[in-house]
């Protein structure tokens, strides 16, 4: 499957160079995430190194010195596994998970060369060729302001292994087809990326791409669960009826369908917004900043419920390891933990809403979407729903948003998905 993902499909390369699928230009995000949506239905775990490689390449190109970019870009975007450099993110520490500002790993500049020392506690794809690492470049500056972003190579220019080691691998509940481990940095050589005073801000670019990828994976897994449930319901009989003909089963499948379609509408809208944002559209940048944590928050929680429902629909067989249901159920819990738990993500949504009058920006955007869609019997209901949800959001944010951030996030997610589903189908020209 690595050969299909990295070589044949070029999923980690298509956003960064031409030539994938014989195309003369880079492919837009909606193509990459559309293919990922399909690929994850057959293999979830491999999407982690794919996402890490893709997002590391993006962040390096965006903030890195041209000399460093030129040094590694061909290997990061190679479609040959023998030449490919995979990426990773080493950020979490045992006492610094969600509280990134508590990171202790420190960086020393000795004669113009940076060296990293410290322990990273949860690192996926730990044997990657390159990793983005947050480290404290000035011990006198506390919090995230003292963190700089570094690129850590597995091997030095001499070919020798860099000075860090994998202490142990994690015995995880799910995601067992890719490794996660603990890393000890022993004065490891690294390249500084961008402005040291903006290290955390730069890392958030990679984090947000990973969050979106988690949402895409959640949506893809929901689709697989739905397809499996539809197959079982159409082929299994009980009480002399097909399961699909039983009203209770129809109701359960409809709920699964609605939640799955909501996630799909959101991830593909986010893909469209990302392309516009990268092309400099300010409104799209602001909306994308909001929609990304919304997807990470809600879709990554919904997939856990959908996976459980799919297991139940298969019955006793769904609880047996011979079928795929147990693996999907275990894997489904990953997305709501990686790159921020639900509480952290919901609070991030509020931060995005409160910045630069984004509440009004988002409301105006949604009204415009509804008004530019052909008027039908649902138009007034959609506009009324916008007014009701945003009235609730404003009230809650003014009173005590910390206790209601999850309700706000869920309300906005389902409102946005409803409106995006109502949009007319658009063809993507490549």
Describe each model-derived feature in a short phrase.
Residues 26-31, 37-52, 56:
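Extended, domain-scale alpha-helical bundle/helix-rich regions
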